[in-house]
Amino acid sequence: MSQKFRLFRACVLFVSLVFATSLRAQEKNPDDKTLRVFIFAGQSNMVGSDSKAADIVKFPPFVGLDEPQKKVKFSYSIGREEMNNSNGWVDLQPVDNVVGPELSFARKVSQEIKAPIAIIKCASGGTTLGADWNPDEPSGFSLYPLTLKLIQSSLAELDKKRIPYRIEGFMWHQGENDMFDEKFKANYGANLQNFLTKWRRDLKTPNLKFYIGELCTKSVWGMDNRDNMYAIRAGQKFVTTSDKLAEYIPTSHDAMEIGGGAGLHYHYGTLGQLEHGVNYADAYLRTIGINTTVARPFKVRPFPQGAPVKLFILAGHRNMEGERAFTGDLSKLKGYESLANDNQKIAYKYNIGGGFKVSNGWEPLGPAGFYGTFGPELSFGATLQSKAPGNIAIAKFTHSGSQMNDWTPEGTEAKDRNLYPQFIAFIKESIKELEGKGQKVELAGIFYHVGENDTAMGGYRNQAAKWLQSTVAKSREDLSLPGLKWFVSQQPPTDQEGLGTIDVTANIAALAAADPNFIHIKAFDLPKQDAELVITTEGIIKLGEVIARSYLEHK
């Protein structure tokens, strides 16, 4: 087969796929004139608690969302004892300097469709589905009838102005407070299904699609209420599995506000809320046949067939994922601008956010985070490439909403958070894929960054080294590599009063002292952090360099 014919066939296939994708979207959404109305409802993490509109400018992908979106209609009732009401339709914008997920949702959806959109929002912190949102016997703040009245009055105003509309989707984020009532917790799944059923009845929309936001496991409650949170998630998943018009929206990979003291928090805060909204937007767009994922294929094969390849496994939590390192900041960092470009000489495979985003096989190394973010893999790969000869492949497995006990072979009672089997399967798959392409693979090591949240809570901090040791030992057994090197990097642990008595650094150092293939990397000279736990762009770059240099010193 000639090269010209292969190129022609590839072009025809590409055009066919593009046409088919466009056709599917048109078939599902033939009307670009009708106003599409979305309902947002829930408790504090739907309100946007502990966020600040003035902070949006800090996060490059979301700059400008503090300004009104004049083409998006907004009707709301937000708060508790004294609700903050729009009293009709207004332009979409932050309410009382608070950032809700509707801001980024609206911009993302508006960028992808021609139809006008509108948002109706009712949210109130500290409320329960079992009481406040109960459609049959509402109590407390009686939010079900209040929200129904808000929706009906908002739609009546559209009718009065003869604006054609359709209710397009219902975004729901709630459940934290139900876990503290045994009856509400046990019945959350049944209550949620009843909630969906009653909305479809009362809004006369039998095919209304619901998007159910996950309770974020990165929060304080994700740690000290693991079992309670698991029970609520199980209820959510029961509904989204049994109801074909309900979709579970993962959020545990989203940013979490940095609290005082040790840094842990209950709320997403500004960045997390903006990412939260993108999650809903992407899910809705998939529903109507629009996939915003950008393909990142190799232009040419990164290394010759049959050539040896060193495989580096990167693993960890918030900073290995790159929660607050933005590609948009690279142009400001002299000497690092090129990291924003794909490196066609290094193969990269990833499974990040606990499977929220997975690469399409092997791609060129480059920024591939969730929201214009990246991790230490970029500078790690660049440093290795400049200092060591040979072919390089990097496979990254992370979940920023996990803790170190989620990575142990034993796992925890929150079974949907047990990562060890997936982690080992990911490593084996990475090796197998490279070997299937004719490469001779050497597993150079596992490069793991210690869980940031684990060092910020006493019970976790005390067990961190023990959990890590269990994971290291079992990985060597399951990969049949008794001498497998683990490079364990650690940033300075939080120094809140009461935590200092648990010397997590010494505990990890003791593991290294007893194991010649366990290298403890004390990354204590990184650029100063803006807040506890999370490292920003410049620090993530330095972390990658520090890890790479440690490998070069110990290879």
Go through each PLM region and give its residues.
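Sec/Tat signal peptide C-region and signal peptidase I cleavage site
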Residues: T21-A25
